[in-house]
Each structure stands twice: as structure tokens, then as C-alpha cells.
């Protein structure tokens, strides 16, 4: 299964996967407005490979059912909260 991957011009770390290069017909207009001008990153064959930040099966399922897959950036690390949790755990030990 081939798909083309585009990065967002408005949302850093956000990528849109579609089955056919430059065919955004299945992507809702509101999503395209929020996504901004898509910039083609690459076209890949999803068969027999893995992706770094997303589950390949979810990508394939979404491409088949929805006609696109939207990859959002991971949530930012809350280092302060992690530090507080470690300190609290150290007090309890």
C-alpha cells in the first residue's frame, strides 16, 4: 500500500497521510484549513515496514476507511511534573 506524506505549514510536527499524491479529496475542508498548505515529504510503501511515531496498522486502517490519516505531534514532556513525582516518591521511600 503506497501513501504520500505531507507536513503541515501551520502545525509543527503534524503530518497528513493520503493514498494518492496530491489527492486531498477525502480530507475534510476544515482539516485542510487548519493544516495549512501541505508540503510533500515523501511517498512510501507501507507494506513490510514500521513507522517511528505511529502504529502502521492504524495508518492503513484509517487510509482504507477514512481516506487519510492525521499524525499529531506527541504531547510535550512536563519535566516539572516528572520532577515533583520523583521527589514525592523519594520522600515515601
Curated annotation (Swiss-Prot):
Matches recorded under Gene3D superfamilies: YcgL domain (3.10.510.20)
Region (Disordered): 74-93
Domain YcgL as annotated: residue spans: 1-84
Pfam family of the protein (one): YcgL
HAMAP family, per database record: UPF0745
Protein name as annotated: YcgL domain-containing protein VV1058
Natural source organism: Vibrio vulnificus (strain YJ016)
Lineage of the organism: Bacteria, Pseudomonadati, Pseudomonadota, Gammaproteobacteria, Vibrionales
